[in-house]
């Protein structure tokens, strides 16, 4: 789990009736982060701040939420909670918490008016803890589904997946909210030639105006105890997306808003290519741990 990285904490807020929620990942002081978006329809907050050429290097928390772009408001509650704790980027006029937001589209699954907001984000932030955390239909993964590109009748549950891998002292871990248009590829089948007809989404997956019937997005956080700068964290986020591409078929579609934040807590020296490779494995395992769908293609 991502909490295997020392100092990383996770909290969930879940509305099982509305089938939505949010998940907060908090980091220890001094954590550096960057991010990468590969999906065509992202809903995000403050990601540009994590670009390597931007000034601020620190990160305090990431909020993963349902509710599509409405759910980004959950980060307001997390900022308020961290400000009350005195955590954030110091200025002459008080601290400004560095909180990134990523949201997935679950409005068509439960109650579309029940999306997370500031109160729910603050509740998830107050619930953070180390050690084992809940996975599956919880937090941002409560209303998550997969397999929708072949039509609504093929949709199955997604959710929150988690994994961690080690190489000596180096730990890389992932927490992923899986709400993909594509299927979870369990990797069990042999690499047979792809049937090109199977690559065409079902007409039932779209409304008459061409818009998707159920929309999507897989979002998450990769954390490592390695000492990395923002450029290194960007490379790790890219490795995480490679893991997403191994575990989902098809990945990164125009109807997905796939995005990952990669955070480094600066505790041990590590080779960047090793950390990137471990990120690939961690994300792949986190997604596949939610259950199989397709065999590998």
Where are these regions (language model features)?
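A structural signal for small-residue-enriched, beta-sheet-centric alpha/beta enzyme cores
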Residues: 1-69, 73, 80, 84-297
């Amino acid at each position: 789990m991502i909490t295997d990285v020392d100092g990383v904490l996770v909290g969930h807020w879940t509305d099982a009736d509305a089938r939505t929620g949010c998940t907060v990942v908090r980091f220890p002081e001094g954590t550096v982060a960057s991010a990468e978006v590969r999906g065509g329809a992202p809903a995000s907050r403050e990601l540009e701040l994590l670009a390597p050429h931007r000034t601020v290097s620190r990160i305090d928390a990431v909020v993963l939420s349902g509710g599509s772009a409405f759910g980004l408001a959950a980060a307001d509650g997390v900022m308020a909670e961290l400000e009350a704790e005195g955590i954030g980027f110091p200025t002459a006029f008080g601290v400004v918490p560095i909180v990134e937001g990523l949201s997935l589209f679950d409005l068509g699954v439960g109650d579309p008016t029940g999306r997370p907001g500031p109160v729910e984000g603050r509740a998830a932030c107050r619930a953070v803890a180390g050690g084992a955390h809940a996975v599956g239909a919880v937090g941002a993964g409560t209303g998550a589904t997969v397999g929708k590109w072949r039509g609504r009748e093929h949709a199955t549950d997604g959710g929150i997946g988690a994994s961690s891998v080690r190489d000596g002292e180096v730990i890389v871990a992932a927490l992923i909210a899986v709400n993909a248009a594509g299927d979870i590829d369990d990797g069990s089948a042999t690499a047979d030639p792809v049937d090109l007809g199977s690559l065409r989404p079902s007409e039932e997956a779209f409304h008459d105006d061409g818009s998707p019937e159920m929309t999507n997005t897989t979002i998450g956080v990769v954390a490592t105890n390695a000492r990395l700068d923002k450029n290194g964290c960007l490379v790790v986020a890219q490795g995480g997306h490679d893991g997403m591409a191994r575990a989902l078929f098809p990945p990164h579609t125009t109807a997905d808003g796939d995005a990952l934040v990669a955070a480094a807590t600066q505790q041990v020296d590590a080779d960047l290519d090793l950390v990137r490779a471990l990120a690939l494995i961690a994300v792949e395992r986190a997604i596949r741990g939610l259950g199989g769908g397709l065999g590998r293609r």
